[in-house]
């Protein structure tokens, strides 16, 4: 992968793709931003609109619409294309339709000669990331999904409201499926460096009503609470994509909970799931293996088993 340029393509200029593009432009994350959509005129319109906001930023990003052929020189291709779940559906229910879209998208991108990093947000993101890895033939470190990055952010926000602490002082991760079966590694959640389990034990009078299982469920259902009120979510996931892309270009070595293809980590093989990973200019440098408790291991394995069952429906 080239190291001297900062070029991004976004495939899918719906609400998630356009929100991601807006974050990327405002933060000056890349030099060039290519927008691709099945509705080319929509991509053209988004590119025009974003170009017109450049003068109000401290950046100078070239934004334009194009096609898969233009992906050849891109460093990162972000895929947000895919159907939104309907009321009553889970993210997993969109798998069949999303998988068909990926076959066309990945084929077109790879035919251009693309040799960079795929960054996925299309749901169900863990399975779609695995599919894109298989279809592309790229090394597993260069196919990354947003995974539980947004869930981990939601977790920290929920805890911050309960504990009255800045969420940036809370560290911890949701693991497993970006969906209903995700779990939280509570044994590794800290507040100001202090284990949350210790805090809850020592301060029962203040925090005795906090129910950890309820927080896990609230975290997993947060997207649906937004969905019920405004129809879909896009700001959080758009910023998550921009954050990961920035970490790649800046070679930050930042630890982010992403969809990563596992090959022995956590005792799991041939599956893509949400885990903390070190993100660098080459993609995933290393999966961070947390020392989980027996109960956490069981919950994590159960989440992965659910993903495997759905993977079989598209031939994996």
UniProtKB/Swiss-Prot annotation:
Residues at the active site: 178
- UniProt cross-references to PROSITE patterns, sorted A to Z: L_LDH
Locate the residues binding substrate: 91, 123-126, 151-154, 233
What is the annotated localization of this protein? Cytoplasm
In alphabetical order, the GO MF annotations are: L-lactate dehydrogenase activity
Q: What class of enzyme is it?
A: oxidoreductase
What pathway does the UniProt record associate with this protein?
Fermentation; pyruvate fermentation to lactate; (S)-lactate from pyruvate: step 1/1
Q: How is the subunit organization of this protein annotated in UniProt?
A: Homotetramer.
* Summary of the function given for this chain in its UniProt record: Catalyzes the conversion of lactate to pyruvate.
Q: What is this protein called?
A: L-lactate dehydrogenase 3
This protein's species is Bacillus cereus (strain ATCC 14579 / DSM 31 / CCUG 7414 / JCM 2152 / NBRC 15305 / NCIMB 9373 / NCTC 2599 / NRRL B-3711)
Q: State the encoding gene.
A: ldh3
């Amino acid at each position: 992968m080239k190291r001297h340029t900062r070029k991004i393509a976004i495939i899918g200029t719906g609400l998630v793709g356009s929100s991601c593009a807006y974050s990327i432009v405002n933060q000056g994350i890349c030099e060039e931003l290519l927008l691709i959509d099945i509705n080319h005129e929509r991509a053209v319109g988004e590119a025009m609109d974003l170009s017109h906001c450049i003068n109000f930023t401290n950046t100078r990003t070239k934004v334009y619409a194009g096609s898969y052929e233009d992906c050849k020189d891109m460093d990162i291709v972000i895929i947000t294309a895919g159907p939104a779940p309907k009321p009553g559906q889970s993210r997993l229910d969109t798998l069949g339709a999303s998988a068909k879209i990926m076959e066309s998208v990945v084929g077109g991108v790879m035919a251009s000669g693309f040799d960079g990093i795929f960054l996925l947000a299309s749901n169900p993101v863990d399975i779609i990331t695995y599919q894109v890895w298989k279809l592309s033939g790229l090394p597993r470190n260069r196919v990354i999904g947003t995974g539980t990055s947004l869930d981990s952010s939601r977790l920290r926000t929920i805890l911050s409201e309960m504990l009255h602490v800045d969420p940036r002082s809370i560290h911890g991760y949701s693991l497993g499926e970006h969906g209903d079966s995700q779990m939280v590694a509570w044994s590794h959640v800290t507040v100001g460096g202090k284990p949350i389990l210790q805090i809850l034990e020592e301060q029962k009078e203040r925090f005795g009503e906090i129910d950890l299982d309820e927080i896990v469920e609230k975290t997993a259902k947060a997207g649906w609470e937004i969905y019920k009120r405004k129809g879909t979510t896009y700001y959080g996931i758009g910023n998550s994509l921009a954050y990961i892309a920035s970490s790649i270009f800046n070679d930050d070595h930042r630890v982010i909970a992403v969809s990563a293809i596992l090959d022995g980590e956590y005792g799991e093989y041939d599956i893509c799931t949400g885990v903390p990973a070190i993100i660098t200019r080459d993609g995933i440098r290393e999966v961070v293996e947390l020392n989980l408790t027996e109960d956490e291991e069981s919950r994590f394995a159960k989440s992965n088993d659910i993903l495997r069952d759905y993977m079989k429906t598209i031939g994996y």
